[in-house]
From Swiss-Prot:
A cellular component annotation (GO) from this entry: extracellular region
Protein name: Probable arabinan endo-1,5-alpha-L-arabinosidase A
EC number(s) reported in the record: 3.2.1.99
Catalyzed reactions: Endohydrolysis of (1->5)-alpha-arabinofuranosidic linkages in (1->5)-arabinans
Taxonomic placement: Eukaryota, Fungi, Dikarya, Ascomycota, Pezizomycotina
Length: 338
């Protein structure tokens, strides 16, 4: 059952009760870092995820039944960096204090640009800033139709203050921006060219948590009404079966908003997102633990939907046991509420 509630902005950050249970999922529901898109020609849903050289599946609705198609890029990426052969194995990933430990070919972001389906993916290696965001395209998303275009030009090394993974493309009235980043100085944004295939100019920071390990990643920008909402994952993502984080330090989904797509994001208390601001949208509750790796999808029947991965504590805490979750979002208070 799906439900929603409305709270005033000052109370929103403190709301920890009343989260709706994740929406139904049948078929292939084990997933990490999902990205959701709907094909224009027939309304079929496609879902991309980390692992297996970008695994993807399809369904007739967001609830499923989800059928695995296979690897998006079975021959790997043309980006010449460690990790382009997709060695990430979710079931054996463990948290070691470094961001995205063992996650090497990851975090897809599916978008449609001028009638062509784009999937942006990340190539990286264990705890490294030697990372890049790549692009693959298809006109149908059918198996075997993907063309790998290699790097978008968004790359990082140890000389940078960011990590070039977790890309998310945003179309602001025909102007494209790539949001990206994980730990270090957290979330950055870079203008893209008009085809959304290559970076056009230098990046700049849009979200940063100065505390602790700067545990911010997986940003997703979504416009609703007059505001741009910057969703992101905060906390420890992985390895819960072998090393459970302190209560409250596990993954959760936060948000800031702005009247501009390019900065000045604040939370419900007015704290800048570049200074540790962030209002909780979804966190651990009931049998849901560590929700994150999120995106927002405008469903033709349901409206705005928050989708993510999570651990069902009744099943198990291993990374390979994480499930696809989704909830309808209520923006009636001016802030997204599950």
């Amino acid at each position: 059952m799906r439900a929603s509630f409305v709270v005033t902005a000052p109370l929103l950050a403190a709301a920890v009760h009343g989260y709706a249970a994740p929406g139904a999922c049948s078929g292939a529901c084990n997933i990490h870092d999902p990205s959701l898109i709907r094909r224009e020609s027939d309304g079929k849903y496609f879902r991309f995820s980390t692992g297996n050289k970008i695994s993807y599946a399809s369904a007739s609705s967001i609830e499923g039944p989800w059928t695995t198609i296979g690897s998006m890029l079975p021959d790997g990426s043309s980006i010449d960096l460690p990790g382009n052969d997709d060695l990430w194995v979710s079931a054996h990933a463990t948290w070691t204090g470094v961001p995205h430990a063992n996650r090497e070919y990851q975090a897809p972001d599916a978008q449609i640009v001028n009638g062509v389906y784009h999937v942006y993916y990340s190539v990286s290696s264990f705890g490294s800033q030697n990372s890049a965001i790549g692009l693959a395209t298809s006109t149908s998303m059918d198996a075997g139709t993907w063309t790998d275009h290699g790097s978008t030009g968004i790359q990082s090394s140890s000389s940078k203050n960011y990590n070039a993974i977790d890309g998310n493309l945003f179309n602001d009235g025909g102007t494209y921006y790539m949001n990206f980043g994980s730990f270090w100085a957290d979330i950055f944004q870079a203008p893209m060219n008009s085809a959304a295939t290559k970076v056009a100019s230098s990046s700049y920071g849009i979200a940063y948590d100065p505390s602790g390990t700067h545990a911010v990643e997986g940003s997703y920008l979504y416009k609703y009404g007059n505001y741009y909402y910057l969703f992101y994952s905060w906390g420890i993502c992985c390895g819960y079966d072998t090393s459970r984080p302190a209560a409250g330090q596990e993954y959760k989904i936060k948000v800031c908003r702005s009247t501009s797509a390019t900065g000045n994001f604040v939370d419900a208390d007015g704290v800048a997102c570049t200074n540790g601001g962030g209002t909780v949208v979804l966190e651990s509750h009931d049998n849901v633990y560590g929700p994150g790796g999120q995106g927002v999808f405008t469903d033709p029947n349901l409206g705005p939907v928050l989708y993510y991965h999570y651990v069902d504590t009744n099943i198990g805490y291993a990374d390979g046991q994480k499930l696809f979750g989704w909830n309808v979002l209520d923006f009636s208070s001016g802030w997204p509420v599950v």
